[in-house]
Amino acid sequence: MTVLGHPRSWSCHCLPVLILLLGIGHGPRVEGVTHYKPGDPVILYVNKVGPYHNPQETYHYYQLPVCCPEKIRHKSLSLGEVLDGDRMAESLYEIRFRENVEKRILCHMQLSSAQVEQLRQAIEELYYFEFVVDDLPIRGFVGYMEESGFLPHSHKIGLWTHLDFHLEFHGDRIIFANVSVRDVKPHSLDGLRSDELLGLTHTYSVRWSETSVEHRSDRRRADDGGFFPRTLEIHWLSIINSMVLVFLLVGFVAVILMRVLRNDLARYNLDEETSSGGSSDDFDQGDNGWKIIHTDVFRFPPCRGLLCAVLGVGAQFLALGTGIIVMALLGMFNVHRHGAINSAAILLYALTCCISGYVSSHFYRQIGGERWVWNIILTTSLFSVPFFLTWSVVNSVHWANGSTQALPVTTILLLLTVWLLVGFPLTVIGGIFGKNNASPFDAPCRTKNIAREIPPQPCAISVELYYIFATVWGREQYTLYGILFFVFAILLSVGACISIALTYFQLSGEDYRWWWRSVLSVGSTGLFIFLYSVFYYARRSNMSGAVQTVEFFGYSLLTGYVFFLMLGTISFFSSLKFIRYIYVNLKMD
């Protein structure tokens, strides 16, 4: 009790510190906390710009030659906002609550040919900008490009020098914000000589209107003003197809496989009764199928420490994914709360480290593992080390290109502190509890000292094609978290059913090496997810450039690895439960 008392007390004091470190207090904002009086100033923050087709390639708005105050004042950001690439700063726009502005000059500029070329390149790459008004994002394109494929060929590039802001209010709160360039002619950037300066006058207007919508939760109006496409709607046909697939698989396992098992059990138990005069070994030599390997099926696998680490981290990500979806269902994530899902993911990852330590150490001790300290180190490194290596490469590329996605040094130190002071200690604490609470592995059958020779196995491949490619790399705003939770449950159910079926076929072939194969069979879905991401990049997206490419493939590989851990864990424990069931019901001497 003395050993466990100190970590438990330490963790209780550390949890509030973790919440403060992550900025939960000022990360997710409570809707409607800002109340205005007529004439009160409304601050407009400029945030970031970037290519429309490269969602993760963003730069600070003031990196472009635009109207900029003499002294840039940055807004204090939460951890989630920093991770999301936000770098908000005050602007020259003067907006007052419920006061319309017909046309006001923002600034006068004289651009050199190099600055004009920078704007031309940004417009050709379809750069968009993002402003923030009262925690509402406002997005629009930097300029306008017109290209004709007919003869004579034309290529015109123009810069939007006038922005029309439209804001809706209800009572003393801002409900909706948008920007448009309708009825505005872009300023041409063509035909400028290398030694010539381009004079520009940036202007803006503000229109206020009252709305009957009382809350920003009406996402049909408040999400993003329709700037990003909203193509992710409920595809009922896909949902029905998934349901039919699940019902077929469950029916296969529950009806067909159970009927086969009953026949096998009846035959094996009848043979056992009729052969009572001979020894068990003589009886085994005259039989075949999964019964004959009952003395080897619970033989512990090689690399048991690595197997337990995979199961522990997989269980952690199952809890993490479920927690994120449940929090989304509770309405904790929406477009107004910048980076809330990032902060929540870090918080949940740190807190669920105890799950990985407990599951890994508990099962490791059950199957006879003695080096539990090494098992804990392996468990805590199984995901964190690949993640750190991937992040280092991606962050270095962002830093070299001046992207806002590159994390500041202070944020890096904060995340490292969270892992060292919370994640790793909770893994150790969970490991201690798991080790101390572990009971001996209760195998229904005894295991021989000499392993049985495995006959030649037939070769087959089973691929479960399940499509749930997240919209992280696109521009859609996905809000159907109820459907996502349902589909997540379908994915786990399908993985469990396939694992049980493949394990039965493997045991029927007298191959008792099911431990690792049960993890790899369904866990290989992670490889498919990565291969699909390659197909998506090449055929379904318009991404380009080193920054976006490195980020896409780096985190796609990491995503496939996480799915391997989660589905491999579900697959293993489903197979273990199934094997216990069939051998418990088998009569043996």
Curated annotation (Swiss-Prot):
It is a multi-pass membrane protein. Residues 1-27 form the signal peptide. It is found in: Lysosome membrane; Cytoplasmic vesicle, Autophagosome membrane. It comes from the Eukaryota. One of its GO terms (biological process) is protein localization to membrane. Keywords: Autophagy, Cytoplasmic vesicle, Glycoprotein, Lysosome, Membrane, Signal, Transmembrane, Transmembrane helix. The chain crosses the membrane at residues 237-257, 310-330, 339-359, 373-393, 412-432, 482-502, 518-538, 552-572. InterPro entries: EMP70. Glycans are attached at N178, N401, N542. GO terms for cellular component: autophagosome membrane; cytoplasmic vesicle; lysosomal membrane; membrane. Plays an essential role in autophagy. This is Transmembrane 9 superfamily member 1. The gene is Tm9sf1.
